[in-house]
Amino acid sequence: MKKSALAITLASLLSPVSYLQAQEISVDETIVVTANRFKQIDGAVLAQTVTVTKEDIRRQQADSLFDVFRTLPSIEVAQYGGRGQSASIFVRGGSATQVLVLVDGVRMPRAIMGGIDFNQFPINSIERIDYIRGARASIYGSEAISGVINIITRASIDDDASRVSAGYGSNNHKKGTFAVSKPVGEGKHIKGVLGYEKTDGFNVKPLPGLNDGDEHGFETLNLKLGYQQNFSDNFSGYVGFSTYSNEYDYDNSSYGNPGWGTVDKHEKKTGEVEYVGADLSLEYSKDVYTSELKLAYGQQDNYDLKSGQSKSTGDHVAIEQFNAIWLNSYSINDELSIGGGLDYRNEKLAKGYLAPSDWGPAKDYNPEKNPRTNIGISAIAQYALNAWTFEASVRNDENNQFGNNTTWQTAAGWKVYEGYELTLSHGTAFRAPSFVDLYYPGYEMPNLKPEESKNTELSLSGVASIVDWTVTGYYNQIENMLIWKGAGMQNIGEAEIKGIELEVKLDTDIVSHEFYLDYKDPVDKSGAEDTQLAYRSKRGAKWNAYATFDQWTLGSQYLYQGERFNGSTRLPSYSLWNFTASYAVNSSWDINAKLSNAFDKNYEMYSGYATPGRQYFVSADYRF
């Protein structure tokens, strides 16, 4: 099946589910197709991109997206404790709300409340993760200021990888998965994944003499179903369904303050997340033209209550989201390709209730615009000639609350000589305020404006012998940043982030290596004096290494995180080591073991919250 350079570009940036899983692609230009890796036409994608396959995830023996993200370049992670606790990611120094997170090319519903708690998403159904750094709002719209992460759960149509797995580890951590992914006839495929996980956890917020002996655990049950079919050589379709139900404990205890008239409070709370989603996509592709239509619906309920009480006694936030996306690409000739997208999004806060608490009586969210709708129209053009590639994109978002937002991006790539390429890009981006920013009960600020940014970056990449390397410098200016002050959120923030990244990948005999270094200066310019942006470090380093020999696969992951600040509170730098081992008993059975935080490092990601010490997990996989 023939795909143009732009078709692949659009696929990777707009809707990678269909295109990146193509097994055979024929074009007039050189294509790099590496098994279980990112597929692209040479020079087609002028952005820094990393793809993580399900094989990579299994090799890491990751429990969650948190485990995966912390191994990727220019991502800092932070969570309030262990498995299942609230977590955030910071890409290139941007905030947790300035990175766009997609599932199969569609926004996660929770984003309308501000930020994505990716620790709640089941990892056992993931086929691939595409991670793009830099501003991409001219393709995706709101939130794509510092990067885009697309979590892909749709399998390729010829995937045949059914398995059963079970494991046990520290803190009474139990996990099991039953997964079927296989062809069921000519051009037909089914996928089904059922997973369960539970851990007792540990005390994530120890307050001596107040909550001694408390444990804050996590439990999840999840299901993913998918069916796809090639109706003809040119026409295909897919339908999917997913649901998960999670429960996690956290601590809301506090010491009393006699001066304020408060007393010690020991309070354990429980959060519950219930998600249901379905999606349908149809794709037509013939010669130089490709078109895809995708419809998706998602509903998520979040409950927050005192442990042991019923859900009716606590907070309840319910979100509904509907997406309709239509993408088209056309190759005019061997040099020039064009494409465009139209997407409609309807976001509804179906329920927004805050139960009575120490802070006051019961309250309800009362959005002025509910549901909130957004229509985005985007266009992209790419011209490739000899050693040069040029790309330009523009997008307009019409929102029934914020009006019009237009973003654009230009990029150029120059193959200096064989194996070396220089790329330069500049683009604008924005982030629309969330319902929490706008309508948090008692602190409503309905007139907030979107955050805005300008991003410029320069990259040089090369392949020399066994070494594949890239150096990237970037400069991101963010204005109208939303900051909590006084009676609520205000557009008074400003940030300036300069950074440089180094990626090196190489193989030495039986060992494959990935080195990531980053240095940045994340400056908060909102106050009278410049300060370091909260929870962002200036320095970071990561090394992932894996060796395969005989029936063994051994791995190690190293992470260095520089010091961070939260106001005047300093969080020291730390280094962590994880080790993994897998033994293939035969063609069907694997035995796996993982040692996390192997040297039992004591560190903090958020001030006052404990992190996991040394932990082990052992598991067995059976393929059929």
Swiss-Prot record:
Keywords, A to Z, come to: Cell outer membrane, Ion transport, Membrane, Porin, Signal, TonB box, Transmembrane, Transmembrane beta strand, Transport
Position of sequence motif TonB box: 29-36
* The protein's name: Vitamin B12 transporter BtuB
- Where is it chiefly localized? membrane
Which species is the source of this protein? Vibrio parahaemolyticus serotype O3:K6 (strain RIMD 2210633)
Entry similarity comment? Belongs to the TonB-dependent receptor family. BtuB (TC 1.B.14.3.1) subfamily.
Cleavable signal peptide: 1-22
Provide a Gene Ontology MF annotation, just one.
porin activity
